[in-house]
Curated annotation (Swiss-Prot):
Role: Catalyzes the attachment of proline to tRNA(Pro) in a two-step reaction: proline is first activated by ATP to form Pro-AMP and then transferred to the acceptor end of tRNA(Pro). As ProRS can inadvertently accommodate and process non-cognate amino acids such as alanine and cysteine, to avoid such errors it has two additional distinct editing activities against alanine. One activity is designated as 'pretransfer' editing and involves the tRNA(Pro)-independent hydrolysis of activated Ala-AMP.
Protein name in the entry: Proline--tRNA ligase
Organism: Helicobacter pylori (strain J99 / ATCC 700824)
Lineage: Bacteria, Pseudomonadati, Campylobacterota, Epsilonproteobacteria, Campylobacterales
Record's comment describing the protein's domains: Consists of three domains: the N-terminal catalytic domain, the editing domain and the C-terminal anticodon-binding domain.
Enzyme superclass (EC): ligase
């Protein structure tokens, strides 16, 4: 490719709203162009990178037995209604009507579509297992698109779905796809972790995220410093804590004027917040109503909203989301902020859940459900039919549930997610097959996704520097850019074109910078665009028969003799 023919409209300054490297560098380098909030055009350089990411993905998925298909971007809303997700997914789901007043959705995920295909064409266990995948455009109506392609509204996604006759077969494919994803991300040169995760709106019994560690990450993962335990903070667990020493006290009610927070209550009674029962009241949003739930945790813990919501739904609440109850909500329920406790609480709220760390809770200080009063010496074993669950957010001071090692937070970006869906979609959409005994059974399903366009951003966040884009071995738009020092020197120009042809013949993806521009400007574009190598052709090259070669990853310079040029270039490209 000749640079003079390349459509790469570079800018003097990055886009004004670009904060991170991933929208800043490709925006300035002419990779992408934003035409709306969270909506981007991919120009030739970005399309080359995306194609390379997709090629790696296709190769590894097909090596692991998956078959490539292409599904409709537009799906009947009635399918989403059958699965129950039309309301559950929320406002991020874009719903529209056609001219005949039929409802459709722009797909953010395709569980309903693929299940409909399976229901119509997979009739026997003999056709199982099967794993189908696609790479296609998706749409999610994000309320606040941010970080460029990391959190865009329109994006490119690799979606995969597998169908099985039993859970054992699904387990095998889950691990098979996990291996494929590890190979894909390794081929792309990323430093990543696999963590236990929440299934979110997609649902399912088990899920794992593939995350890339980066300081600009929008997610927090919890990692053990001693073993391989890692989990998204939304579901992270900890080992049972050692209880501080506390002298037993008799059950009594004390006046505690204006003492409404766990730390202030602990200070008032000269004890640790650990022994204070903290009440957190939330509004539970259902499809057609709102209720109240009260969650109890120790005073030095915080509620993890995802765990709390999942626990409610395990109890049959069919909750869509949680919102913190305000003073008006509490007043309507007859509750007093700062003094809420378990005594007589059932008449005020619909759901009461205690963190599992409170199962043996005694010597507790709790709100008396009376203004300016707390009860001390409370033993929860004296209450009947309490519901316990893991609802707290793990802290960095907590210990690993596997080995007791120290847990630490890391910022990360999710790039892939795999789920065991079980039979949930098959049951709701009536997708079944005949087993070996001739009995009708529902499919066991798996779901597997990788953010293709997000990977473009993530690679830049992890690899780039302040000068511009740095790509990995299998993702750079060009292997080599040939930079002519003085294009008006016919000898330099002639040699540059000869070298260009020599490299093309060896299969090197080369770009010849034949623009009539200053040498410094060309080198700045090399640093900005991020070809893997820059090969300099100048006056000294003509005299010494040696080329200066610069690696973009670390800007390391190397001298290469003309006679060894192709061999050395291929070695350098293979080694990174």
């Amino acid at each position: 490719m000749l640079f003079s023919k390349l459509f790469a409209p570079t800018l003097k300054e990055p886009p004004k709203d670009a904060v991170l490297k991933s929208p800043k560098h490709p925006g300035k380098a002419g990779y992408i162009y934003q035409i709306g909030s969270g909506i981007y055009n991919f120009l030739p350089l970005a399309k080359k990178v995306l194609d390379k990411i997709e090629n790696v993905t296709h190769k590894r998925m097909q090596e692991h037995g998956a078959q490539n298909i292409l599904m409709s971007f537009v799906v009947l809303a009635s399918l989403w209604e059958k699965s129950g997700r039309l309301d559950k997914y929320g406002k991020e789901l874009l719903v529209f009507k056609d001219r005949k007043d039929n409802d459709f959705v722009l797909s953010p995920t395709l569980e309903e579509n693929i299940t409909e295909i399976a229901a119509n064409f997979i009739k026997s266990y003999k056709q199982l297992p099967v794993h189908l995948y696609q790479i296609h455009t998706k749409f999610r109506d994000e309320i606040r698109p941010r970080f460029g392609l990391v959190r865009a509204r329109e994006f490119i996604m690799k979606d995969g779905y597998s169908f099985h006759e039993d859970a054992e077969s699904l387990d095998k494919e889950f691990l098979n796809t996990q291996s494929a994803y590890k190979e894909i991300l390794s081929d792309l040169g990323l430093d990543f972790r696999i963590v236990e995760a929440d299934s979110g709106a997609i649902g399912g019994s088990k899920s794992r995220e593939f995350v890339v560690l980066t300081e600009c990450g929008e997610d927090t993962i919890v990692v053990c410093q001693n073993c391989d335990y890692a989990a998204n903070i939304e579901i992270a667990k900890r080992s049972k804590r050692t209880e501080p020493l506390m002298s037993p006290s008799a059950l009594a009610k004390f006046p505690t004027p204006n003492t409404t927070s766990a730390p202030s209550v602990a200070e008032f009674f000269k004890t640790e917040p650990y022994f204070v029962l903290k009440a957190l009241v939330n509004k539970v949003i259902h499809k057609d109503k709102e209720t109240l739930a009260c969650f109890f945790v120790r005073g030095d813990d915080n509620l993890e909203e995802t765990k709390a919501l999942n626990t409610l739904n395990l109890l049959g609440a069919n909750a869509l989301e949680l919102r913190e109850a305000n003073e008006e909500d509490l007043n309507k329920a007859g509750l007093i902020a700062g003094f809420i406790g378990p005594y007589g609480l059932k008449k005020h709220v619909c759901y009461i859940i205690f963190d599992e760390d409170l199962k043996e809770g005694d010597c507790l200080i709790v709100g008396a459900n009376e203004k300016d009063f707390h009860a001390v010496g409370v033993d929860l074993k004296g209450f009947e039919n309490l519901v316990y669950a893991d609802i707290v957010q793990v802290k960095e001071s907590d210990c690993c549930p596997n080995c007791q090692g120290a847990l630490k937070y890391h910022k990360s970006l999710e790039v892939g997610h795999i789920f065991k869906l079980g039979q949930s979609y098959a049951k709701s959409l009536k997708a079944s097959f005949l087993d070996k005994n001739g009995k009708e059974r529902f499919f066991e399903m798996g779901c597997y996704g990788i953010g293709i366009s997000r990977l473009l951003s993530v690679i830049l966040e992890q690899k780039s520097d302040d000068l511009g884009c740095v790509w990995t071995k299998n993702t750079a738009p060009f292997d080599v850019v040939i930079v002519v020092s003085n294009l008006k020197d016919e000898a330099q120009k002639k040699l540059a074109f000869e070298v260009y042809e020599r490299l093309l013949q060896k299969g090197v993806d080369a770009l010849l910078d034949d623009r009539d521009a200053r040498f410094g400007a060309k080198m700045r574009d090399f640093e900005l665009i991020g070809e893997r190598l820059a090969l300099i052709v100048g006056k000294q090259t003509l005299e010494s028969k040696e080329f200066e070669c610069i690696k973009r990853a670390n800007l390391e310079k190397q001298t290469i003799k003309d006679i060894e040029l192709e061999e050395k270039i291929l070695e350098m490209l293979a080694s990174e």
